[in-house]
Amino acid sequence: MIKLFIDTNVVLDTILPGRPFADSSAAVLRMGGDSCRMYLSSMSVATLYYVAEKIVGKDDARAVVSEWFRKNYVLPVSDICVYDALRSDCPDFEDAMQIACADYGDCDCIITNNVKDFRSYAPLPVFSPEEFLAGCYAASARRIEYLSSLPDARSIDDVVD
């Protein structure tokens, strides 16, 4: 199972009107399930609540955060994350905290709309939502092509057996 660390801006794209990456961000957030788990930092949850409260009010903001908890996971910003962020060369402290949290949480990659800054400092792969979706599509296409090339294989069960 792949562990995706979702940067704050990806979630905000789905609740703020007129954001340029809203569609791809929403598509990534719908992917959670058996094949991948999505994680936010506790710092992102606070930001998400704050922004949602300004847009939809206190009760609905709580519903937005509750919806995230229903399907996904939250990583704490620990003292280790803060220490790592302080030692980082990353000039943006918030980005450094997110990177440290993703690394400490043993995530496989970071999904952000700020790939330029994150890629320079993150010790793990960084993708924009569009890049991640394109990679998933390409992997699915290769799998379908492979399965269809097998003689008389009608399903994955035929291959596994």
Where are these regions (language model features)?
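Short, structured coil segments at secondary-structure junctions
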Residues: 70, 106, 121-122
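Short loop/helix-cap segments at secondary-structure boundaries that form the rim of catalytic
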Residues: 116-124
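Short, well-structured N-terminal submotif of metal-dependent ribonuclease cores
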Residues: 1-40, 55-60, 120, 137-161
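Short acidic-hydrophobic, aromatic-tinged amphipathic segments that line or gate anion-handling sites
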Residues: 75-77, 126-129
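Helix-adjacent hinge/juxtasegments
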Residues: 51, 56-78
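Alpha-helix capping/helix-boundary segments
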Residues: 10, 44, 81, 98, ...
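Active-site neighborhoods of divalent-metal-dependent phosphate/nucleic-acid chemistry enzymes
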Residues: 74-116, 159-161
